[in-house]
């Protein structure tokens, strides 16, 4: 997975109005949090309505579902209904084996794996995943840097 370009993803969308305003600005990807304990969590039904609207009006914007430590069968069953997300972003402790299994089950969906970076040594966690995922959103903790996406 060599770095090819930088993308802009706006995440934590909770309404159609937010999604459309952000889409109008020209973002590359819009993310919805599918993690129950998140304050920005929205239901699968509401997410599907937002993603359908985006798919119809802005088909080139990636639609990202952010999940955390979800069983693979739950992702397949609960998150990939019509209209399909274009990307699943893993934001938990998912290991390489998990990434391989998920990619095998849904080969046509992009797979991103997020990493929390607190120091330079944390960057070493990324390398082993490079051949098993499509992009790496990197969040810096305790730094004043924005989240970056390596694709």
Residue ranges and their predicted role:
Residues 38-51, 92-106, 121-123, 143:
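Active-site-adjacent beta->alpha loops and helix N-cap segments on the catalytic face
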Residues 3-9, 58-65, 106-116:
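Short beta-strand/loop segments at the ligand-binding rim of alpha/beta enzyme cores
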Residues 58, 82-83, 106, 130-133:
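A structural signal for short coil/turn segments at secondary-structure junctions
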Residues 2-56:
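Basic, often amphipathic N-terminal segments
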Residues 17-24, 72-82, 121-131:
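Catalytic cores of alpha/beta
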Residues 33-36, 63-70, 78-98, 110-121, ...:
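Catalytic beta/alpha-barrel core
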């Amino acid at each position: 997975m060599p770095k090819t370009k930088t993308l802009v993803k706006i995440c934590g969308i909770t309404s159609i109005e937010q999604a459309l305003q952000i889409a109008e600005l020209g973002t590359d990807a819009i993310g919805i949090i599918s993690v129950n304990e998140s304050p920005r969590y929205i239901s699968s039904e509401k997410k599907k309505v937002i993603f359908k609207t985006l798919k119809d009006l802005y088909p080139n914007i990636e639609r990202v579902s952010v999940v955390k430590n979800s069983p693979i069968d739950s992702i397949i069953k609960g998150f990939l209904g019509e209209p399909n997300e274009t990307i699943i972003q893993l934001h938990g402790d998912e290991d390489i084996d998990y990434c391989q299994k998920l990619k095998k089950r849904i080969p046509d969906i992009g797979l991103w794996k997020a990493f929390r970076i607190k120091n330079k040594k944390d960057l070493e966690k990324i390398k082993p995943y490079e051949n098993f995922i499509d992009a790496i959103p990197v969040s810096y903790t305790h730094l004043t840097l924005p989240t970056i996406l390596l694709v």
